[in-house]
Amino acid sequence: MGLPWYRVHTVVLNDPGRLIAVHIMHTALVAGWAGSMALYELAVFDPSDSVLDPMWRQGMFILPFMTRLGIKESWGGWSITGEPIANPGLWSYEGVAGAHIVFSGLCFLSATWHWVYWDLEIFSDPRTGKPSLDLPKIFGIHLFLSGVACFGFGAFHVTGLYGPGIWVSDPFGLTGKIQPVSPAWGAEGFDPFVPGGIASHHVAAGLLGIIAGLFHLSVRPPQRLYRGLRMGNIETVLSSSIAAVFFAAFIVAGTMWYGSATTPIELFGPTRYQWDQGYFQQEIDRRVQAGLAENLSLSEAWSRIPEKLAFYDYIGNNPAKGGLFRAGAMDNGDGIAVGWLGHPIFKDKEGNELFVRRMPTFFETFPVVLVDKEGVIKADIPFRRAESKYSVEQVGVTVEFYGGELNGVSFSDPAIVKKYARRAQLGEIFELDRATLKSDGVFRSSPRGWFTFGHATFALLFFFGHIWHGARTLFRDIFAGIDPELDIQVEFGAFQKIGDPTTKRQVV
């Protein structure tokens, strides 16, 4: 049977054994890729600096997902949290990656077995001797089993009852660690940034799945509903499954891009909205003001700012700054961060403090403008010097650093002042090593950006797939061109293989 490439799945339409085989093989490919990719990432990952060179700066994609589920130790003798380790055992990065590869091999073997031994008695209707699947019953079984898994994850793994817990951190991504989480049963459980909601929602959704699964196992669908939704047609299963997948993909694209307790910034990097809203800048300013209120000097107050917090307040870590089609990790763009130079404070010749206007997310170039506390422009780097009124030279701008490597150092040379004013557009100023990786200086996105783009794109494609297959199964008789006035009863859909001569016909 010569089929075009876009119709090859016809061969498993009415062949339950081989339908199972191709799905097991798909699972083998997914698990094999996950395990292999994890081992590759472990081979290239440098765990030496979790503050300035975390996994998301290095372009790790699998490791953040493993870490958020409670894995933190490596057979290489390091821990993602920097704690000393003794014997990580199977519950480690390499152990879990290896388990996925072993599982992939077992799935490959079982897929091969089911492909060869496709004609099993279990797939035949004993009354007719023909292939038949009780799809509502199968739906009930799968719903029950997925409910058990969902409940078990929330009640045992996340809570630490039998498992490690999950990654939990503070709102500014400074104190993250693996810890058990108690379910949040109140209104706070609906806050996407409350980890307790992960436990409670998995428990609740799991119980709902178990109850719904038992319902579908014990209650048969009404005949009109069965026929109206084509519940006997395997393409109905395909359509509704695609719907579940695209819905989930849209949800996780949102929780990743906008941030949530499931996507901590220590593992996936900050969100673009944290730059847009000056989230870290406000927290840094709050801490500095608190230090000044304790009678600390400006230098001492800035020296207490964690380097990790300052690093988040840098536009190069904004996932929306990297183009979607610029391949590579963030480190391949602006380089590997080496150290925080400190916070620059600019002043004019009268001693008034000036603030560099920060670059908005969607600008590649932006005028360097310095404003006073009222927002009035006082200095800039002009495009045309002949017409300038506010140039650094004319206004007499100087810069002094507080905290960081240049703490207490000041500059009045206009060329140096302009250099740091340009860099202050991008947030806190860091020394970046572009030589080691031959970084090209062009910003890259973080795994947060890749994940969102991939899942939003495939969700859209799967949405159209759901519409396509749903329409095919609901309106199969119309699409097949069967005359509605036909007086011969055709049992259409019992055998759907192309050219099948055994479809029953019966004159009414």
From Swiss-Prot:
Binds multiple chlorophylls. PSII binds additional chlorophylls, carotenoids and specific lipids. The chain crosses the membrane at residues 21-36, 101-115, 140-156, 203-218, 237-252, 457-472. InterPro entries: PS_antenna-like (IPR000932), PS_II_antenna-like_sf (IPR036001), PSII_PsbB (IPR017486). Gene3D superfamilies: Photosystem II CP47 reaction center protein. It is found in: Plastid, Chloroplast thylakoid membrane. It is a multi-pass membrane protein. Keywords: Chlorophyll, Chloroplast, Chromophore, Membrane, Photosynthesis, Photosystem II, Plastid, Thylakoid, Transmembrane, Transmembrane helix. One of its GO terms (biological process) is photosynthetic electron transport in photosystem II. One of its GO terms (molecular function) is electron transporter, transferring electrons within the cyclic electron transport pathway of photosynthesis activity. Pfam families: PSII. One of its GO terms (cellular component) is chloroplast thylakoid membrane. The keyword Nucleotide-binding does not apply. Belongs to the PsbB/PsbC family. PsbB subfamily. One of the components of the core complex of photosystem II (PSII). It binds chlorophyll and helps catalyze the primary light-induced photochemical processes of PSII. PSII is a light-driven water:plastoquinone oxidoreductase, using light energy to abstract electrons from H(2)O, generating O(2) and a proton gradient subsequently used for ATP formation. PSII is composed of 1 copy each of membrane proteins PsbA, PsbB, PsbC, PsbD, PsbE, PsbF, PsbH, PsbI, PsbJ, PsbK, PsbL, PsbM, PsbT, PsbX, PsbY, PsbZ, Psb30/Ycf12, at least 3 peripheral proteins of the oxygen-evolving complex and a large number of cofactors. It forms dimeric complexes. This is Photosystem II CP47 reaction center protein. It comes from Welwitschia mirabilis (Tree tumbo). The gene is psbB.
